[in-house]
Amino acid sequence: MSTPFYVSPEQLMRDRADFARKGIAKGRSAIALQYADGILFVAENRSPALHKVAEIYDRMAFAAVGRYNEFENLRIAGVRLADMRGYSYDRRDVTGRALANAYAQTLGAIFSSGGEKPLEVEILVAEVGTTAADDQIYRLTYDGSIADVRGYAVMGGPAEQVADYVGEHYQEGISLAGALRLAVDALGHDSSEVRQLEPDQIEVAVLDRTRTQVRKFKRISDQTLARILSESRPDTAPSPESSAHTEETETVDGGSYESAAGTSAADDAPIAPPEDPDDNRPL
């Protein structure tokens, strides 16, 4: 009789963790940034149909990296949980903390189970408050670990390099234009060669506390994104007069751009699920 093959629990968990990390690293990075009026999400995403950032409930949003079919199932489950709780009790009872705890239990149970592979995903759950101090951002990893982060969070791809760049330049209370420029520049500094990302290569959305609608989530269109980036891009060859007023010309806080507090009916239209939910390409 042959001796059964044995793998220690420690080795099994290490192998599962390595498997999940490698899958997540194949995707592209996503960033969540707190700015003066809410929370900004910026993700490198070249697909116009497959969203990495989505609305969950009135004041809550979801961002993810990794295998699309896996985190899309988590997003749908989160929307259903939030809707059920809001309908059964009160809309104020739907909180980001409760949703993050539910996701943590699901991810942890799948990771510790030997019968199925771990999910190759990392997700962010964000809830915008009435003030910046009330904003909440929760980061959840493949093994169900949950962290309450402040200021900014980066996940997917070369997350450490992108996070280092954000950490060097991030300032509390930054404007929307400044936060967007910082996030786009950070995504371009994910390797030794600096890349210039175009509006059609990134996905941008905000949770804007200044919106009059109950739903605070809004996507930023490519046209608005291009305008904000052009206004916030520093001039590489300033004239003598403009160089004498560098601080004034580089200030974009008061720049004219489309407000995130849109009022059109299209802004509040629910995001339809993609046509091919079985697409397993890493995003």
From Swiss-Prot:
Main subcellular localization, coarse class? cytoplasm
Family matches, as InterPro entries: Ntn_hydrolases_N (IPR029055), Proteasome_alpha (IPR050115), Proteasome_alpha-type (IPR023332), Proteasome_asu_bac (IPR022296), Proteasome_sua/b (IPR001353)
Q: Where in the cell is it found?
A: Cytoplasm
The cellular component terms of Gene Ontology attached to this UniProt record, alphabetical and capped at eight, are:
cytoplasm; proteasome core complex, alpha-subunit complex
What does this protein do, in the record's words?
Component of the proteasome core, a large protease complex with broad specificity involved in protein degradation.
**Annotated region (Disordered), positions in chain:** 228-283
Record's Pfam families?
Proteasome
UniProt record similarity statement? Belongs to the peptidase T1A family.
Name under which the protein is recorded: Proteasome subunit alpha
Gene Ontology molecular function: threonine-type endopeptidase activity
Q: Origin organism of this chain?
A: Kribbella flavida (strain DSM 17836 / JCM 10339 / NBRC 14399)
Assembly with partners or alone:
The 20S proteasome core is composed of 14 alpha and 14 beta subunits that assemble into four stacked heptameric rings, resulting in a barrel-shaped structure. The two inner rings, each composed of seven catalytic beta subunits, are sandwiched by two outer rings, each composed of seven alpha subunits. The catalytic chamber with the active sites is on the inside of the barrel. Has a gated structure, the ends of the cylinder being occluded by the N-termini of the alpha-subunits. Is capped by the proteasome-associated ATPase, ARC.
Stored NCBIfam families: 20S_bact_alpha
* Coiled coil segments of this chain: none
Quote the HAMAP family the UniProt record gives: Proteasome_A_B
Could you list this entry's UniProt keywords, alphabetically sorted. Answer: Cytoplasm, Proteasome
The domain of life is Bacteria
